[in-house]
Amino acid sequence: MADLFFGGPFRRILYGRPFPPDWASASATAAMDWVETPTSHVLRINVPGLGKDDVKVQVEDGNVLTVRGAAPHAAAEKEREREKDVVWHVAERGRPEFAREVALPAEVRVEQIRASVDNGVLTVVVPKEPAPARPRTRPIAVSSKL
């Protein structure tokens, strides 16, 4: 009975190649957490298998933080797959490169941003500008001429 459903034309629909190898854009996005502490913004981005030389972090005009990464073997692997007579059956692992842009708040110290990679997680620490001192209000006694 299962052969009736999973065999023939249904097998091709259910298990066939739904998308060509380039179904995803060249730049996929990476999962990210963004938390704000009293002194900084902390971004943690999943970069499995990438080291510090495989990730580029920069701030563009308008306080846009850009993070890009690519596996060192990605280009060579991609070329080998194009040269061979390769048939893709499943493509679930995503692309070996990614890009992520984050609009940072205006009150950050761009020149003090730090980034590090550890166990497949890129951590970017963006220090905040200190809050401006609140103006102190002091009552002034008003006298009248009598």
UniProtKB/Swiss-Prot annotation:
Gene3D superfamilies: 2.60.40.790
Cellular component per GO, a single term: peroxisome
UniProt GO molecular function: unfolded protein binding
Microbody targeting signal (motif): residue ranges: 144-146
Protein induction: By heat shock.
Domain sHSP per the UniProt entry, residue ranges: 23-143
The keyword Cytoplasm is annotated on this UniProt entry: no
GO BP annotations, alphabetical order: protein complex oligomerization; protein folding; response to heat; response to hydrogen peroxide; response to salt stress
Subcellular location: Peroxisome
One Pfam short name: HSP20
Keywords linked to the UniProt accession: Peroxisome, Stress response
SUPFAM superfamilies cross-referenced by the UniProt entry: HSP20-like chaperones
Similarity-based family: Belongs to the small heat shock protein (HSP20) family.
Subunit structure and binding partners: May form oligomeric structures.
Protein name: 16.0 kDa heat shock protein, peroxisomal
